[in-house]
Regions:
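Hydrophobic hinge/microswitch elements
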Residues: 75-78, 83-87, 93, 140-198
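Central regulatory/effector-binding core of bacterial HTH transcription factors
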Residues: 35-96, 164
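A late-sequence structural motif
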Residues: 50-52, 121, 126, 197-238
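Beta-alpha-beta core module
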Residues: 98-105, 109, 168-218
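Secondary-structure junction motif
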Residues: 93, 120-126, 132-154, 219-223, ...
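Alpha-helical "hinge/linker" immediately C-terminal to small N-terminal DNA-binding modules
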Residues: 2-34
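Short beta-strand-centered segments that line the small-molecule binding cleft or hinge
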Residues: 13, 17, 55-59, 76-111, ...
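Flexible hinge/capping segments at coil-to-helix
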Residues: 33-34, 98-134, 223-224
Length: 239
């Protein structure tokens, strides 16, 4: 058979990109969401997924009923997720760094220490906090939360008894135990609503949240419209 040369493969890739650019240009004019019939994939972990995307879906149903929203886990987002079109948008506190990757900050959260008040007193001092056993979220491959790495860099060493792959795994371990979880405060509005929380007795940085997309979608009218809808949801949900 005929084997494509590297030059031919490069030309084919350029042709695909050109066709994509022409298609996006055709969509960059007037856009009617009511006529949008497509699947839009957003990569988000359970914190931002549960906080934002149900409200986004409810909003989309009003004006873009033909749109299917597909949600996949972002874990630690990679450039390939966006460059390879595995998703059209990422929502994450860790935007991948690339010249062809764009981002916009959606909101900023702060950290609180969650615990079961039936099992322990609040950790009000640094000594209480460091003496306790902790639970945290670790994304594969063993990528700790930015907070955990920040505290370790400050010489604040905690004893981790449990590590789970997502925020949804925290409540079953915290309930009925003396474990502490230092996680985003807005989890208190849904996932951790039945637990108590206090301000961390150690210095914690803020946690920004971004929406991230590939530059190929910057002038796409449909993509731009959906980004605007997400920002509107943030304005309603994040107060």
């Amino acid at each position: 058979g005929i084997v494509a040369t590297a030059r031919a493969e490069a030309l084919a890739a350029q042709a695909r990109e050109l066709l994509g650019a022409l298609e996006r240009f055709a969509r960059s004019g007037e856009f009617d969401p009511a006529r949008w019939n497509a699947t839009f994939t957003i990569a988000a972990n359970d914190f931002q997924r549960d906080l934002l995307l149900p409200a986004l879906m409810a909003r989309l149903r009003l004006s873009a009923s033909g749109l299917v929203l597909r949600v996949i886990p972002s874990d630690v987002p990679s450039l390939e997720m966006l460059r390879g079109e595995h998703c059209q948008l990422v929502i994450s506190p860790r935007p991948p760094d690339g010249a062809d990757i764009l981002q916009k900050r959606l909101f900023e959260d702060r950290y609180r220490v969650f615990y079961d008040p039936a099992m322990r007193e609040p950790p009000l001092t640094r000594a209480d906090y460091l003496a306790a056993q902790h639970i945290t979220v670790v994304y594969e491959p063993r990528r700790a939360l930015d907070l955990d790495r920040h505290l370790a860099a400050q010489g604040i060493q905690r004893r981790f008894a449990v590590m789970v792959p997502g925020f949804a795994g925290l409540p079953p371990f915290i309930r009925g135990s003396e474990l502490l979880a230092t996680v985003p405060a807005r989890l208190q509005s849904h996932l951790l609503r039945d637990l108590a929380s206090v301000e961390p007795p150690v210095p914690c940085p803020p946690m920004p949240m971004y929406m991230v997309w590939h530059a190929r979608h910057q002038v796409d009218a449909a993509h731009r419209w959906l980004r605007g809808e997400l920002e509107a949801v943030v304005g309603d949900v994040v107060t």
